[in-house]
Amino acid sequence: MNRSIGVLDSGVGGLTVARELMRQLPHEQIIYVGDTLRCPYGPRPEEEIRQFTWEMIDFLVAQGVKLIVIACNTATAVVLKEARQKLSIPVIGVIDPGARAAVKVTRSKRIGVIGTKMTIESNSYEKALRHVEGQVVVESLSCPPFVPLVESSQTSGPYVERVVANTLKPLLSYDMDTLILGCTHYPLLAEVIGRVIGPNVQLISSGDETALEVSALLDYNGITADLDRIPEHVYHATGDTRSFERIASDWLHHPVQAKRLVLGTEEEKCV
């Protein structure tokens, strides 16, 4: 089935998942929506996160997508269960895949989780980890400065190193062997996070495991794309498209052109 896969995020972070989808499923076409105008979602009230996420979901459904990936940990924590109940197409989040990936690699069963305020306060990762491995010990930390850094294209340099080091300081005394990057923005800071946290801690991003789950669901539902299909990915951003295009082009390693999307109106539209 040559309909597109819909991928949504509060901003550019979901591109880390989209890149893995493109790598593992090269014949599948993606429609990406990043709500860069209203990013970050983490500090927002739950009802606001729910409203904004449903606006993106409704837009993607109107585009005729065959499957939706909520490539935002905060939105996954708030909306995934509800979306699965209400929609007739498969919907995948990024928390369960991230938890499974962490349990696969940990030896000590001591796992750290970093994420947005909402994701950490929801305890979604702790629940998901304990569902997979009941003996796991989890230490979580909210990292509010990280998403604004990524959205403003600041992913390296002395200032970023300083911010990351100061933010992660409470975790440095925790004896863990695995750290979940519990926000899809955070892999863009992975090099800096890795230097701060040390070489003995494995960093986990949910992109790879999420793509595996998407592949399995496409096969199970008989909706995989034709193998001779050449996809033309489509990108939408609610904020500054030039900034989005710059970050997306760097991360995806190919030129990206984005359409401006207006959400929150009676009829979502591209401008």
Swiss-Prot record:
Keywords carried by this UniProt record: Cell shape, Cell wall biogenesis/degradation, Isomerase, Peptidoglycan synthesis
Protein's pathway: Cell wall biogenesis; peptidoglycan biosynthesis
Record Pfam families: Asp_Glu_race (PF01177)
GO terms, biological process: cell wall organization; peptidoglycan biosynthetic process; regulation of cell shape
GO molecular function, one term: glutamate racemase activity
Binding site for substrate: 9-10, 41-42, 73-74, 184-185
Keyword Lipid metabolism included in the entry's annotation: no
Source organism superkingdom: Bacteria
Catalytic activity: L-glutamate = D-glutamate
Catalytic-site annotation from UniProt: 72, 183
EC number: 5.1.1.3
Family designation: Belongs to the aspartate/glutamate racemases family.
Function text: Provides the (R)-glutamate required for cell wall biosynthesis.
Record's protein name: Glutamate racemase
Protein's organism: Exiguobacterium sibiricum (strain DSM 17290 / CCUG 55495 / CIP 109462 / JCM 13490 / 255-15)
